[in-house]
Amino acid sequence: MQYHRIPHSSLEVSTLGLGTMTFGEQNSEADAHAQLDYAVAQGINLIDVAEMYPVPPRPETQGLTETYVGNWLAKHGSREKLIIASKVSGPSRNNDKGIRPDQALDRKNIREALHDSLKRLQTDYLDLYQVHWPQRPTNCFGKLGYSWTDSAPAVSLLDTLDALAEYQRAGKIRYIGVSNETAFGVMRYLHLADKHDLPRIVTIQNPYSLLNRSFEVGLAEVSQYEGVELLAYSCLGFGTLTGKYLNGAKPAGARNTLFSRFTRYSGEQTQKAVAAYVDIARRHGLDPAQMALAFVRRQPFVASTLLGATTMDQLKTNIESLHLELSEDVLAEIEAVHQVYTYPAP
């Protein structure tokens, strides 16, 4: 395994991290513990969870992911060797009730969310606590176009950052990060930290893959000059980049087979792009998933590539991508496809 020091922090993360959003839905607790055992044995030290997980979110399963990981941590006994990252949910974006009646990113809700996450995870602190998505209405989760609004968010970024700072001072959070953020949001957090002597955010967790390279426009430059590096998620586009959904295939137990609401990676242009990328991989004797993950890992703004798997075979294949370095010929062919199918699944 390779490791990377995140700027402006003492966090040294494995360049592959373990994503967990299937724990409690597609994966049982026994499955989850087996994945954790294997990942850690391979040198992975970054485990990413969220109070909302598993996905798709349901009241009856909310928090199970953290519970499963917490039970494993209690049994494993090496908490200090691991980097545990969790997330506080923002306001509901689907007009449902959310986790709490008033799911604003204010002091009250952050206090409650953090308390519950620590309890489920059976730990006294989090190495990284991330704002899962912004309080304000903005572009994330595949939203296209920008909806102009004259109203200010009910809770300002300063209020959110000040609340997070309180729990950092209390020793319950080591570092702060954001997720599903924009260049404006990242720069605003950094400006407020400097102006008010508050802790700066050290990471951003956004989607990044061959199907969604929008991070390269704006946020990559912020990452380079401000040192806020990417924890890349959805690097296989819900498994789409493996090619398993091509030609209308619906593999039993696969995420897009089970949950038809997830259409982000199902569009016609996306399928054409996937077919082209899979063709590149096969012509060069590469596993399509490993090629896609190796492309993400090689980007200079990526601190860690988060892996998601529902089977041990998938996890093993994904971790093996660590040993793959893409040739100049492969990279040139990838860029040629990107020129034709640019951001088919933002």
Swiss-Prot record:
Pfam families listed in its UniProt record: Aldo_ket_red (PF00248)
Question: Could you name the Gene Ontology cellular component terms for this entry?
Answer: cytosol
Mind telling me which CDD domains this protein's record contains?
AKR_Tas-like
UniProtKB keywords: NADP, Oxidoreductase
Q: Which GO terms describe its molecular function?
A: aldo-keto reductase (NADPH) activity
- The keyword Repeat is assigned to this record: no
The residues that the entry says bind NADP(+) are: 234-244
In terms of superkingdom, the source organism counts as Bacteria
Active site (UniProt):
53
Under NCBIfam families, the record lists: PRK10625.1
- The name of this protein is Protein tas
